[in-house]
Amino acid sequence: QMRLQLKRKLQRNRTSFTQEQIEALEKEFERTHYPDVFARERLAAKIDLPEARIQVWFSNRRAKWRREEKLRNQRRQASNTPSHIPISSSFSTSVYQPIPQPTTPGSMLGRTDTALTNTYSALPPMPSFTMANNLPMQPPVPSQTSSYSCMLPTSPSVNGRSYDTYTPPHMQTHMNSQPMGTSGTTSTGLISPGVSVPVQVPGSEPDMSQYWPRLQ
């Protein structure tokens, strides 16, 4: 309790200022930061305050002004710092390497064209595919001719039905110049995909009765 009482005695009562007093003090502070004793006494009589309180207010106001001025200087330096940072030559050389410029305007294009030409020349030439090379037109041999003709009976009439021998258009000239086949010539007739039966094509009157049971 004694301690609290002593502390209260040492503490000074805070002075409360009215709006008119603060305005008069601020106006005097704008005129001078260090008013003399005569100015303080005249102001004290004007705003009804002790001269000691006015002196303390000016002291606190100057301290506040110095803090604000310090902050303003720091902000001003921070805003001006990026434009005034010196860049050393070693830093700029190590980070930003100079870009080599071509000696002549067309040198870069010339090098590019040469590289493209070398690339395309290194590719193997594409083989030319023509119908004449891949599909040679050879005259049909008698065995091929007979294989086409054996797909249907060569007899004019079998079991009362007549059949005509199928001849491809491009083989008609060879069919007219070459005989259908000689006696004893044997070829393979294609009945269905993957099935083949030997068929004898005689040159004279054929006997088809022995072949029809196989086909049926």
Swiss-Prot record:
One of its GO terms (molecular function) is DNA binding. InterPro entries: HD (IPR001356), Homeobox_CS (IPR017970), Homeodomain-like_sf (IPR009057), PAX_fam (IPR043565). The keyword DNA-binding applies. Residues 10-69 bind DNA. This is Paired box protein Pax-6. The keyword Iron does not apply. It comes from Gallus gallus (Chicken). It is found in: Nucleus. Belongs to the paired homeobox family. Its main location: nucleus. Residues 68-109 are annotated as: Disordered. GO terms for cellular component: nucleus.
